[in-house]
């Protein structure tokens, strides 16, 4: 029991000596280290973050351009598999966009109906341009060149071959 004796006590040993139901139990150290002995390094841009509750979480570095490109390619391949064609849809005033599978739709009317339901909005397109009111929105799309065009101005099949993104904007009508 002298001071010359060196002992390595863990937090579990020290906590078992105290009263687990007493007031001193709130001051004991409950941290636990989990070491699996896995050998993987941080040379590939992997960083470790505290995931809470004492766990470390491996996450790729934000600067790792190869990783970002691989994830984007994987997402694109996942979304555009055989029989599907997903495009992003953003609505003015809504901070989060959505994706919609155009191959599952049967034309412009089905697209408009789906977007009306998805965003709870009255959406106009080229065929219904004359029917406007104050709460209407206009559906446009970005083609391969990045030009924004009115949805419905070309046949559906041609639209599917050129569309890259959809945007729902407020219709600004000045009388």
UniProtKB/Swiss-Prot annotation:
Region (Disordered): 1-29
InterPro entries in the record: AUX/IAA_dom (IPR033389), AUX_IAA (IPR003311), PB1-like (IPR053793)
Any GO MF annotation of the entry: identical protein binding
GO term, biological process aspect, one: gravitropism
Main location: nucleus
Motif EAR-like (transcriptional repression) per record, residues: 34-38
Compositional bias segments (type: Polar residues): 19-29
Disulfide bonds: none
Listed Low complexity bias regions: 1-18
Gene3D superfamilies tied to this protein: Phosphatidylinositol 3-kinase Catalytic Subunit, Chain A, domain 1 (3.10.20.90)
Induction line: By auxin.
Family: Belongs to the Aux/IAA family.
Domain notes for this protein: The N-terminal half of the protein contains two conserved domains I and II. Domain I includes a slightly degenerated ERF-associated amphiphilic repression (EAR) motif which seems to be involved in the activity of transcriptional repression. Domain II is required for the correct degradation of the protein through the SCF-mediated ubiquitin-proteasome pathway. Interactions between Aux/IAA proteins and auxin response factors (ARFs) occur through their C-terminal dimerization domains III and IV.
Function: Aux/IAA proteins are short-lived transcriptional factors that function as repressors of early auxin response genes at low auxin concentrations. Repression is thought to result from the interaction with auxin response factors (ARFs), proteins that bind to the auxin-responsive promoter element (AuxRE). Formation of heterodimers with ARF proteins may alter their ability to modulate early auxin response genes expression.
Name recorded for this polypeptide: Auxin-responsive protein IAA20
Organism expressing this protein natively: Arabidopsis thaliana
């Amino acid at each position: 029991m002298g001071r010359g004796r060196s002992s390595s006590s863990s937090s579990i040993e020290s906590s078992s000596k105290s009263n687990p139901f007493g007031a001193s139990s709130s001051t004991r150290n409950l941290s636990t280290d989990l070491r699996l002995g896995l050998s993987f390094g941080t040379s590939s841009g992997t960083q470790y973050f505290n995931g809470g509750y004492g766990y470390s979480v491996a996450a790729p570095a934000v600067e790792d351009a190869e990783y970002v490109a691989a994830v984007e390619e994987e997402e694109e391949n996942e979304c555009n598999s055989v029989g599907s064609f997903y495009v992003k849809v953003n609505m003015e005033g809504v901070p989060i966009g959505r994706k919609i599978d155009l191959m599952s739709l049967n034309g412009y009317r089905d697209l408009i109906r789906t977007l009306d339901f998805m965003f709870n909005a009255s959406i106009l397109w080229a065929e219904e341009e004359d029917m406007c009111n104050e709460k209407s929105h206009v559906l446009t799309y970005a083609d391969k060149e990045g030009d924004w065009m009115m949805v419905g101005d070309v046949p559906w099949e041609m639209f599917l071959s050129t569309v890259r993104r959809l945007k729902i904007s407020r219709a600004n009508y000045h009388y």
